[in-house]
């Protein structure tokens, strides 16, 4: 921490933070409680303030009263660190609410390119105040512990003065952002969600200012904080728990499917060409593909297999077993497993313990997520049609039930994929016989990952999230936001590897290898020191798995590109990403450094790269 002089002053609705010679303003008049039918501003409430001074620091506690219900805010500075702490505490506040917006956003209104905001949506986004595109909508409405924020924090830098704001109780918190087209401002702040309808407990945030700062400095502040809190578990530590971690590093990622069956009430159902709603590739065909890839010289490979259960991909979960009968049944799956084992390749199955399908043979509405209004949630979105969400408290039991059956058939699993857990928001359950908070949901999801570890199976999920990192080893991808949009769509900001600057040496991230009209995504895989897909079918493919001449040429090129990425990953997977930046202030020319040893330079205008060792 470089800044040594911080003072907090209150002026009416404003809180002023004097950091050395820099002034940061926060208008508390913008804070409010959102109820179902109205919005109540903090400055409309009866309140009183008191100064607090003790052995830790000093600050101001404000007690608010609304309809004879009281809550308090406490803003204080920790003397030993100069960290600013924000606490929101229910005293006698038992009212149900939708959200509490506190603290307010900082004033950040200069139309300057070097006034930037750092957003942790997916891998990371940088937004200059002058950025040409609007950014006002976040994934999952900004809810922490989802892909809206791989890490529950954000930061802002004006010239070389900056801060990072960290949520310390993220499971019931979210954030919002307002950046209009061409700026001139970016406002970002946190809000508090009810836990089973109520405020329930003290919510905590931490604000850390930094002088002469940059993107890397703020990320390293966060990394230090994560280490202090025990969130930081390296791949080397995970490898001591399961030696397959080292085996996965440098592997070619192969994503393939077996059975597709799209029911009529799914939004993906093709009414014009109904024959396209079903597809089948046998386990034998997939085994032949594995043989073919081995003949191509691939020495390390991980197969992620979709739709291996009899109902087909995204159908009947959690009752997706037995192995797909039409594709060869348990014997066919065992043959595929043996083929992978023969070549020392790794095998993992797609699995799902959130989407709870009405078509499941054991479906029970009493195990489905009950909403606050006591109704059972339902939707018809994915291939299997009408579904609810499974109460997460039951997920560990279903995971154990299903994996015990798979392993009993001597299927050689060294990794597996529990869909959406680290991507989608946390769930609550309002069933009066068994209430579940979001924090408990998070803990139950982690129990599922830990069970896999107990079977020497590496756990993965759709994306990555800090709350899962003690157990999660890898994921389907950990991409930049724009990579999941069409190449010609407007971007929300400049892609930056905020997550990898903190956690690169803690998790394995595969990267898409697409070549669009303007960019080669392989460059991002190199910049981030990740691993590569050698082939990846979509979630709802309609393919036959056959190789033709054109496919052979394409496959040869994909293998060549994979080897470039894998060679680097094997050198840097266990190293911290120690530096990142732009060359000549050009966002299209970026560099990263791993362990102060290896530097990667990419040019997204020329689609070129350079890897420098022993720097």
Labelled PLM ranges:
Residues 116-122, 130-133, 333-336, 379-381, ...:
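Short C-terminal domain-edge/linker segments immediately following a structured domain
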Residues 78-84, 105-108, 321-324, 366-370, ...:
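Short, low-complexity, polar/charged sequence segments that are solvent-exposed and flexible
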Residues 12-17, 157-159, 169-173, 177-216, ...:
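Active-site-proximal substrate-binding groove within the catalytic cores of carbohydrate-active enzymes
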Residues 246-400, 411-416, 422-434:
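Aromatic-lined carbohydrate-binding/catalytic grooves of carbohydrate-active enzymes
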Residues 1-302, 308, 325-327, 339, ...:
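Carbohydrate-recognition beta-sandwich/jelly-roll modules
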Residues 96-98, 110, 313, 357-359, ...:
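Short acidic, gly/pro-rich beta-turn/loop elements at beta-sheet edges
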Residues 122, 354, 466:
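Residue-level detector of flexible, active-site-proximal loop/helix-junction positions
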């Amino acid at each position: 921490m470089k800044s040594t002089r911080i003072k907090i002053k209150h002026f009416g609705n404003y809180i002023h933070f004097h950091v050395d010679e820099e002034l940061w303003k926060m208008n508390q008049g913008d804070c409010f409680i959102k109820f179902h039918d109205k919005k109540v501003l903090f400055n409309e409430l009866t309140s009183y303030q008191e100064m607090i001074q003790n052995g830790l620091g000093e600050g101001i506690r404000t007690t608010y009263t609304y309809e004879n219900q009281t809550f308090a805010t406490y803003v204080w500075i920790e003397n030993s660190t100069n960290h600013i702490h924000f606490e929101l505490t229910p005293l006698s506040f038992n009212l149900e609410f939708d959200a509490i917006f506190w603290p307010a956003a900082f004033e950040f209104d200069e139309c300057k390119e070097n006034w930037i905001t750092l957003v942790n949506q997916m891998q990371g986004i940088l937004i200059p105040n002058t950025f040409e595109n609007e950014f006002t909508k976040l994934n999952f409405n900004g809810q922490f512990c989802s892909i809206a924020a791989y890490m529950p924090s954000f930061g802002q830098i004006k010239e070389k003065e900056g801060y990072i704001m960290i949520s310390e109780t993220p499971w019931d918190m979210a954030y919002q952002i307002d950046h209009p087209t061409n700026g001139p401002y970016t406002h970002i702040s946190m809000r508090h969600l009810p836990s089973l309808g109520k405020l329930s407990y003290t919510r905590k945030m931490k604000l850390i200012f930094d002088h002469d700062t940059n993107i890397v400095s703020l990320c390293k502040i966060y990394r230090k904080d994560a280490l202090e809190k025990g969130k930081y578990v390296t791949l080397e530590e995970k490898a001591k728990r399961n030696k397959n971690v080292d085996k996965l590093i440098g592997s070619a990622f192969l994503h393939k499917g077996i059975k597709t069956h799209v029911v009529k009430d799914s939004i993906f159902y093709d009414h014009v060409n109904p024959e396209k709603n079903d597809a089948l590739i046998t386990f034998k065909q997939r085994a032949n593909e594995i043989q073919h890839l081995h003949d191509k010289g691939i020495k390390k490979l991980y197969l992620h297999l979709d739709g291996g259960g009899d109902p087909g991909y995204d159908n009947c979960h959690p009752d997706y077993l037995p192995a797909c009968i039409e594709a060869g049944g348990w014997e066919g799956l065992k043959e595929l497993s043996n083929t992978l084992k023969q070549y020392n390749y790794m095998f993992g199955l797609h699995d799902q313990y959130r989407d709870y399908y009405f078509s499941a043979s054991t479906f029970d509405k009493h195990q489905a997520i009950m909403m606050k209004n006591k109704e059972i949630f339902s939707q018809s979105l994915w291939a299997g049609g009408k579904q609810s969400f499974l109460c997460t408290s039951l997920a560990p039991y279903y995971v154990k039930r299903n994996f015990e059956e798979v392993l009993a058939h001597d299927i050689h699993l060294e990794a597996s994929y529990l869909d959406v857990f680290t991507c989608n928001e946390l769930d609550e359950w309002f069933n009066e016989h068994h209430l579940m908070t979001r924090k408990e949901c998070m803990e139950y999801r982690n129990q599922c990952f830990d069970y896999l570890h107990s079977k020497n199976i590496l756990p993965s999920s759709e994306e990555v999230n800090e709350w899962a990192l003690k157990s999660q080893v890898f994921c389907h991808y950990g991409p930049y936001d724009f990579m999941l949009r069409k190449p010609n769509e407007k971007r929300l900001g400049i892609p930056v590897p905020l997550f990898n600057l903190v956690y690169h040496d803690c998790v394995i991230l595969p990267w898409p290898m697409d070549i669009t009209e303007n960019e080669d995504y392989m460059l991002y895989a190199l910049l981030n020191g990740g691993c590569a897909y050698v082939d990846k079918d979509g979630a709802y493919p309609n393919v036959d798995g056959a190789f033709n001449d054109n496919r052979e040429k394409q496959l040869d090129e994909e293998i060549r590109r994979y080897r470039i990425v894998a060679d680097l990953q094997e050198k840097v997977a266990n190293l911290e990403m120690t530096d990142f930046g732009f060359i000549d202030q050009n966002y299209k020319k970026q560099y990263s450094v791993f362990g102060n040893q290896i530097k990667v330079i990419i040019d997204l205008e020329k689609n070129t790269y350079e890897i420098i060792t022993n720097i």
